[in-house]
Structures are given as C-alpha cells and as structure tokens.
C-alpha cells in the first residue's frame, strides 16, 4: 500500500511520530476553540440493545462479546460515538452554542481496507447543541468553514515545527451538492467524481450524501439514524449533511476527513 517512490520527508519514524502528536495536540485545541467544545472521556464499549452504538450504514456488525461480571450480558465495541454523544450532551445539560469532543477509538471489522481505511479507527468525534433556527444549510456551511479554519491553522503551526511539511491548503473550501457533482461528471462513478472535483479545488465539502440522485443512486451510503439528507435546503436541493474532503498529493486522490451534518 506504500506508493512507488515514496520517501519520508521527515527523515525518520521518530520524527513522524513527533509530527503526529503535534498535529493531534494542535488540532484539538484549534477545533475546540472554533466550535466552543469541551473535551470529555468516552467509552470504547457500550451494552448491546441500548441504542448507543453507531449502526453506520445499517448492515455492519460490531465486535460483540459477553461480559462475565454482568451475567453474560452482551457488549459491543463502538463503531463511532454518533449516538452516545447526544446522550452525553443531555446528561451534562450542555447549553446552546456549546458542545463536546472526544478522542474516539473504535473497531470496524467489516471495513474495506486500503490506504485510508482500517479496522481500527482513531478519530475526533464531536457534537454541539444548536437552536431549531440553526437547522439550515447556511449554519452547516458556517460550521464547515470553522472546522476548515482549524485545519489550516494546524497546517501553518505544523510548518513552523516541521518546515519540510509545506502548507498546501487553499484559502477557502469549495461547496457543492452531490447532485451538482453528478451533473458535472455524469460519466464518472461517485469516487471518481470526488477525485475530479477535489483535484481541482483541493478542499471540498459535498452536501446531501445519502439522498437518491437523478441517476437513481445515492452518492454514498449514510446512517438514517442521524444523517439528514432529506430536508430541503436553501439551495433548492436536499440535505443538511455532507463530507469534507481534501486532496492527498502522496496518494494522488481525494480523502474524506470529516463526515458530518445537522
């Protein structure tokens, strides 16, 4: 899976590990500042049948096992914390405009493996409380821009510590609906469409993923439990969700760094 001709521009695995830690430390501070988030501790295991695990696309099975100390009750390794976070917000009585984030560890044994997907998931998971009036495409885009700003600030700070890693992100992120993307590249499959638009714009947010498009197919599968691809938005399309993708010059393809929505 290592691209032909790849070399470590940091010179050693030790420097790579230092850079990874720097990115994680910087980004969590930048993200929490942009979105007014408090870091919380999250579980890796939840009890089966409680409705707390993420069903992803509705067909993936979690790693499950009986718990001896709980009379053999079934427990599951989390897929993600999408549902758990909402329970936590309610338990903590988090006010409007504030939220939580966590460094999530999960297992997805049915994941299709490649350079960007593993059965082990280590990601930032976040959620915040908003008002009913903020359920809009405008607010979604505003939030995406804040996240993108946190990424850019992290990129620039990383460059100060590791000048071999030069900033490459554009000033602004490009927004497009999945239907618009289909009309733009009707002869390409969804992944090819992503690669084409992200290669051109470098940073893209695709709106409305999960909705059935004019070709009779969704751009990609999403969880019906929490992904809203059906609400009519201000642009005349449907969806208050989407994916944030960046261009990866090493792999020469787009890669999703955030799947999110209202």
Language-model segment annotations:
Residues 102-195:
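Extended, charged alpha-beta segments that form solvent-exposed binding/catalytic grooves
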Residues 1-117, 125-129:
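Class II aminoacyl-tRNA synthetase-like tRNA-binding/catalytic domains
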Residues 98-100, 121-125, 201-203, 241-243:
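Extracellular structured ligand-interaction cores
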Residues 20, 24, 96, 119, ...:
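Active-site-proximal structural scaffolding
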Residues 31-39, 145-156, 214:
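Hydrophobic/aromatic-lined pockets within catalytic cores
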Residues 107, 177-262:
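A translation/RNA-centric and nucleic-acid-associated enzymatic feature enriched
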Residues 71-88, 138-146, 187-211:
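Hydrophobic transmembrane alpha-helix bundles
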Residues 55, 90-92, 115-118, 139-141, ...:
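Surface-exposed beta-strand edges and their flanking turn/coil or helix-capping segments
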């Amino acid at each position: 899976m290592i691209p032909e001709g790849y070399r470590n521009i940091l010179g050693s695995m030790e420097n790579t590990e230092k850079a990874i830690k720097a990115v994680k430390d910087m980004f969590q501070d930048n993200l929490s500042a942009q979105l007014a988030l408090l870091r919380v501790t999250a579980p890796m295991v939840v009890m089966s049948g409680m409705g707390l695990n993420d069903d992803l696309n509705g067909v993936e099975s979690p790693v499950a096992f009986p718990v001896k100390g709980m009379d053999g009750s079934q427990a599951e390794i989390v897929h993600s914390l999408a549902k758990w976070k909402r329970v936590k917000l309610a338990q903590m009585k988090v006010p409007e405009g504030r939220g939580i984030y966590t460094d999530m560890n999960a297992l997805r044994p049915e994941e299709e493996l490649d350079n960007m997907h593993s059965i082990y998931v280590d990601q930032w998971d976040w959620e915040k409380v908003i008002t009913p009036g903020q359920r809009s495409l405008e607010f979604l885009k505003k939030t995406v821009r804040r996240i993108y700003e946190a990424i850019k600030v992290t990129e620039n700070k990383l460059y100060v510590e590791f000048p071999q890693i030069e900033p490459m992100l554009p000033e602004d992120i490009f927004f497009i609906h999945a239907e618009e993307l289909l009309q733009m590249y009707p002869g390409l499959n969804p992944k090819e469409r992503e690669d084409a638009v992200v290669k051109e714009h470098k940073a893209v947010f695709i709106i409305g993923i999960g909705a059935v498009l004019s070709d009779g197919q969704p751009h990609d599968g999403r969880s019906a439990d929490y992904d809203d691809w059906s609400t009519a938005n201000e642009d005349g399309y449907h969806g208050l969700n989407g994916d944030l993708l960046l261009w990866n010059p090493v792999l020469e393809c787009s890669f999703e760094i955030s799947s999110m929505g209202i």
